[in-house]
Amino acid sequence: MAWYDEARFYHIYPLGLTGAPQNNDYSEPVNRIKELTPWIKHIKEIGCNAIYIGPLFQSGSHGYDTTDYKLLDSRLGDNEDLKKFVKDCHKEDIKVIFDGVFNHVGRDFFAFQDVKQNRENSRYTGWFCNINFWGNNEYNDGFSYENWGGHNLLVKLNQRNPEVINYILDVIRFWVSEFDVDGIRLDAADVMDFDYMKSIRGLANVVKEDFYLMGEVIHGDYTRWANNDTLHAVTNYTLHKALYSGHNEHNYFEIAHTVNRLYDMAGGNPLGLRLYNFVDNHDVARIYSKLSNKAHMIPVHILLYTLPGIPSIYYGSEFGIEGNKENGSDASLRPQLNLKDYKDATDKNPLTKVIAALGKIRAKSPALSYGGYTQLQLTNRQYAFSRNVNGENVIVVVNNDDNDCMMTLPSNSVEEYVGALSGERIYAEGGNITVNVKACGGDIYLPLNDVMGEYKPVDYSKVLKEVEKQAKKKVKEEKKDTSTLPKKVRNVPYEEMTVEELQACIIGKMRNNGEVTDEMKRTVMENVYHDSLVNWVESFR
């Protein structure tokens, strides 16, 4: 199996974590990336064995407006500094994947600057999409062009141009030869050309053993992207949404339905559809901020580490930090952190201790990486399932209620289990085990044998006690008003519809499938990206 099948990712947004200036003046490099070195030990301590880091390369602002793909952003240092960071990670057996922003470039990118200077005579006009020298934009370029997400700061690359394809493939070869990177996360993969991505996959298959490609996909049929010809994995936004709303609404049916649908999409094969599971990242609110009852941090993370897929922790969330978008800005989601402020967190911070335990449990159990999934019991407030591979059967239980509960579950021919979090030994009787699941908690029951060994209990009651000091209140989220959506939608191709028409279509198709909750409406209304909405509406069957 490949390394990524057993990966436990730690996600770093380096410009934020290191406190780099928001705008790049392209001055002399400042080695801020060295500030990440102490984090390597911490990342290993919490049981992660892979880092997704980015964006990294020279850009004008947030990192996604690339200026130079072969030069580390000068706000972070120079190429030698990045080489050292990756080498230090590899010494600790930690893999590293970079953020590959290959859908669009920044306005300072050399080829776009040539178009600005030479207009129709530029040899690079074919590198970009839909350049119109009769148009204009807010920069008064005297021409218009296709962008990403309505932002002219991000210039869409023509991904069917052989020169563009070869240029990006050369960038990837350079990243491997120069930095020894282990894979790439493709930004905005859900709006990238499929043949373009297949060319990237073709290179990935030969450029380095087990070179990993993971794509950012918001909605749709994930198998269109994650397959043997395109990408190895995609971001699991569907589960991300279900994990927090399923707890906020005390509705484990939403989570189980999501898991079953994704598992069926993969043909019932746990490795048939590799998904990158997460509860927060650099684009969405922190999980601690999204949860109405902060005690649900425990069952949420138990599920993150035990459901099919590859788990990921976003830097700082293991400490329980908060973060919401403010005035449309992502800055509060990408804060500067000093690891010294969280010294000995794996001993002193109860939440960090639980997440570290989950990482180590995941590392020791092949069933949690490779095992099949079977739902055992489901109510609004309790959920149990098993993961099984090569005779190893693991049972996972979670409870979102404020009271303990008893659950009786099939033992699957295992005579004795041990709770990996509680340390509790459970004996099977009559082919079943009966377990007491703590309020706002859960456990992972592993077969007691010599291979798995003994487990020291993790007392997550301290997390719950801290939460009890806070008033249980709903996270303040403005409900998006759907009354502004058009009553009638034009009979035109989806590509020609407005954002509002696409949103109305999606909500209408959701209604055809059943009740549409406020959470579902809000998810639709928060997506204002035309290409993403087109992909979403086309995913309904």
Task: Enumerate the language-model features and the residues they cover.
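Substrate-binding/active-site clefts of carbohydrate-active enzymes
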Residues: 1-9, 13-49, 56-178, 200-206, ...
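Carbohydrate-interacting/catalytic domains
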Residues: 1-52, 58, 88, 259, ...
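Structural preference for beta-strand elements that scaffold enzyme active sites
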Residues: 7-11, 50, 93-97, 183-185, ...
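Conserved, mostly hydrophobic/aromatic
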Residues: 12, 43, 53, 69, ...
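Active-site-proximal helices and loops of the catalytic beta/alpha 8
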Residues: 86, 90-92, 116, 177, ...
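Active-site groove signature of glycoside hydrolases
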Residues: 104, 168-194, 277, 281
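Active-site clefts of carbohydrate-active enzymes
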Residues: 270-292
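Basic helix-extension-helix modules of the SAP/HeH family
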Residues: 482-541
